[in-house]
């Protein structure tokens, strides 16, 4: 089940010290019981990058969300317009993409692709409650991070080849220096 899969993810993060403090894992509840969403102000969908699966999940959880609840996707590749096709009309003004940079416990940036009242509400939550930096993005392929990141990595590989630098050395030299935690 999805809840069991999510729990395995929590267990893996505990082993890898993925939480700032181990007790933070107690705040994560892995479950298939969508009724647990009824009183939530913000629900973040973070399942695999399959548009049909995301649409199915939105349809399944919609009856449990309050009218005011914000819903966002942590996608890093799917366009907002495509995701909105699976979101009920009444929820669309409360929907956005909130792409958290990985690993989120270290990286402060969150790409925000939204419209209407959702953008202001999520920006406030991201910045004031989570202590992160919200980057407003247009609904373009790869948003900002993947577009720049892919170019940056490709340029790094090209320069490493050009100057006969091993990939391991290039990675060690630039990873942490540019804020890449691993």
Regions found by a protein language model. Give the residues of each.
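A short structural micro-motif
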Residues: 29-31, 176-180
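Rossmann-like NAD(P)-binding element
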Residues: 3-71, 77-82, 86-89, 105, ...
